[in-house]
C-alpha cells in the first residue's frame, strides 16, 4: 500500500502539494545558511528538520485536507496545532541544551513563549504517529558563546532570539518559494557595498569641486578624513561628535561603508529617532545610491508613494520583512523594539542585523529609562554577532563605563572610540550661535510679541498646549509673511507638508518673514536655518540641538542668537524632561556651553537624577516588570511578556484618523468594505493620538465615530489647516515625540 504523503503546503493556484519532507529540508538549508553566519553551524539544520514535525499529526493532515477540499478518512479534526511537537523532540534529543531551540520551535508561528508556557507545552504527550526515524543530531554549543554568556547572562535571550530569527525567516522564505514563486524571484539582485562606496566617493568629490574653499568646508573635509582613518579600525563601538554643520551625516555614512567593506559586512543600518529626520535623510541617500539600494522602514512609510515602479515597490515591501538590503534607514523604535520582540514578523530581520554596521543618529535621544536594556542588547550584537556601532550627534551622551544613577548604576559599553580628537576643538571653530538665558519668566503674550519683532524666528516649546497657545497669540502675518505651527496635534501627512512648505519658504528671498512655533519634533536633525531661535527651558542637549537650527549654514555676518526662556506658570513637564532641565540648572556654569566637557558634566548630573535605567511597566495582567526580571535569568526567560513591556516610546494613546486631504476618500473606501493592510497603513499617515479619557469625551460628543476598528474624527471643523486638531484639554500638556 502506498504511503500517504505528509502535506506541508498546498499551492492554491494549481493545487500542487509540497511534502513536509521537502519543506523541512528546504527550511533546513536556509536556516543553516543563516546560523553559520552567526557562528552557530549545525543549528539551522537541526531547527529546520524539527520545526514542522508536528504536521505529521493526523489532526493536522485532516485539517489541511479539509481546508483544501481534499477527501479525508475521518472528516474532522480536534487539534491542528503542531509547533509544540518540534519542541518536544528537541527536549528528547537534546536534554541539556534544549532551551536553545525549544523556545524557537514552540514559537515559530505564535511567537516565543514565556518559560512557564514552554514548560506546559513540554508536558504534552508526543503524538504516537510522529516518526522518530532520521531525526537530526543535536549540534554543539560553541565554547566562545558559552564563555560569553557565563560572563554576561543577559546575552542568552538575544542569542535565542537570533536563532529564532534564522528559523522563522527560513520558514517564510521556503514557503514563499513554493506558494508565491513570483514574489520569491523579486528578492536578491542587490548592489554590493564596494559599488555603493564608489558612488559615495564620486558624490563627495563632486561636492568638493563645486563648494568654495571656506573654513566650514575645510572642517567638513577634515571630518571626512578622520572618518576614513577611523574606518580602518577593528569591529567595535565608535562615536562621532561633530557640531551642527560639520557634515556629520555623509561623513558617518562614509565611515560605515569603508568599515563595512574592510570587514566584509553586508549592510549598513541608519537608526534615527524621528520620522521627520528619516524622510530627509533617506531622500539624500536615495539620490546618491539609487532608489534600488536604500530601504526606508518606519510606521509612516507608504512605499507606493515613494516608488513609482510597481515592481520596485513590491521588492521593497518584501525587504521590509527581513531587511535583506544593503542600506536600511529606520527608526530607533523599529530597530530596538525588534531586538526585544517575540513574534515572527518583528524577529525575521534580526539575523540580517548580525554582521552589519549600525549608525545611531542623534544618540542623545535614546530614552534614559530604557538605557540598560538598550546598551545590553547592542553590547550583545557587538560581541556575539560582530556588529560595529557608531553613535553620532553634536550632543554626545556618556555611555561608556559605569554611570551613577539616583538609586542604581548604568553599566555602559566597555569602550567607545571617539573619531574626532578633542584637540581639534570643532565646537569653537564651528561656533555660529550665542546662547542667552533669560532670567525672568515670560507669559504667552510676551513671547508672542517677541516673536513678532523678529523677521525670521523659530520657537521650540515642550508641550503641544504651549505651542498652540503661543501660535494663537501671534498677530496676523503682515503681507507676504508666513506663520507656521508644528506639533503632534497635526497628523503625519499634515506635518510633512508643513515642514516642506517651511523649507521652501526659507529658501525664498530673505525678505520674506517666517515665524515658526513648534514642539521639539524639529529640534534634532531637521534641516532648517533661522537667524534667531527661542527655546523653552529644557536639558542642555535639547538646548544645543535647538541652537543647531540657528545660523546653521553660518551665513550671518555675526553669531546667531538662541534665547532660552521660562514660561510663566508652565513648569517643565514631570519625568525625564524635568530631570534634564534640573540637571542643567545643577551644573556649574561652563565657560562654553558648546564644549564637549560641558555635555559630559550635564549627562553626569542628568544620570544622577534618573530613578532607573530599566523602567518597570505593566504586562496585560497589570503586573510590573523590568527587562532584567524578564530576560536576565537564563532558566526563567519570558519572551512574550518582554515583548509587551519593552516600548521605546509610551504608546498608551488611541489613534484617531483626522479629516485631512486623502483620508476622507480612504474612509469612504473603508466604509465600502475595503479591508486590507495597504489601506490601514495609508490611514496611519492621518492619525493623531488621544488619551482614553479624551477619546471618551469626543465619542460622547458625537465627534468621533468607530469604523471597522478605527476611530475617525467626523467633525471637520475640529481639524484646522494651521494647527491640526483643535482641543483645549489637559492632555495637550503631554509631550509626544515619534
Regions found by a protein language model. Name each.
Residues 2-202:
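Accessory nucleic-acid engagement/destabilization modules that flank
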Residues 8-12, 296-310, 462-465, 483-501, ...:
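Conserved helicase motor
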Residues 234-256:
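Walker A/P-loop
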Residues 265-289, 298-301, 398:
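Conserved Walker A/P-loop ATP-binding site and its immediately adjacent core
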Residues 290-340:
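Inter-Walker segment of RecA-like/P-loop motor cores
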Residues 333-336, 346-384:
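SF2 helicase catalytic motif II
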Residues 382, 445-446, 452-454, 465, ...:
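C-terminal helicase lobe and adjacent C-terminal extensions/tails of nucleic-acid helicase motors
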Residues 395-452:
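Interdomain hinge/linker at the junction between the two RecA-like core domains of SF2 helicases
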